[in-house]
């Protein structure tokens, strides 16, 4: 196993471990939010703790997804052009989602 493959494997394992409590937290939070009024939801979603967890979850989740998809493309896509286009599509998707979430957090913070 090369050095970069080992680093990728280690990051995949640690990010998946980090996502377990984050996903659990957000599943519980969604159930709690479903029973709240609109004003209570806005209050909860505006808390710094919640916004930080949203950013952490988004960043770790997107990096984990990106690495996983890169591994799948590396293993199953053999055409050079298709591989480059797939990598570009993944990177654009990740950048777009991260941009939307970051902008949402900023707008919630300044509100």
Whereabouts are the PLM-identified features?
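Membrane-embedded alpha-helical bundles that constitute the cytochrome b-like, heme-associated redox core
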Residues: 1-111
């Amino acid at each position: 196993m090369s050095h970069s493959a080992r680093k990728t494997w280690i990051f995949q394992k640690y990010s998946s471990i980090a996502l377990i409590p984050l996903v659990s937290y957000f599943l519980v939070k969604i159930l709690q939010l479903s029973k709240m009024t609109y004003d209570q939801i806005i209050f909860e979603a505006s808390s710094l703790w919640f916004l930080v967890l949203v950013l952490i979850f988004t960043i770790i989740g997107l990096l984990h997804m990106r690495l996983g998809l890169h591994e799948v493309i590396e293993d199953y896509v053999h055409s050079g052009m298709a591989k480059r286009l797939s990598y570009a599509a993944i990177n654009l998707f990740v950048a777009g989602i991260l941009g939307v979430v970051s902008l949402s957090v900023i707008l919630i913070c300044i509100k």
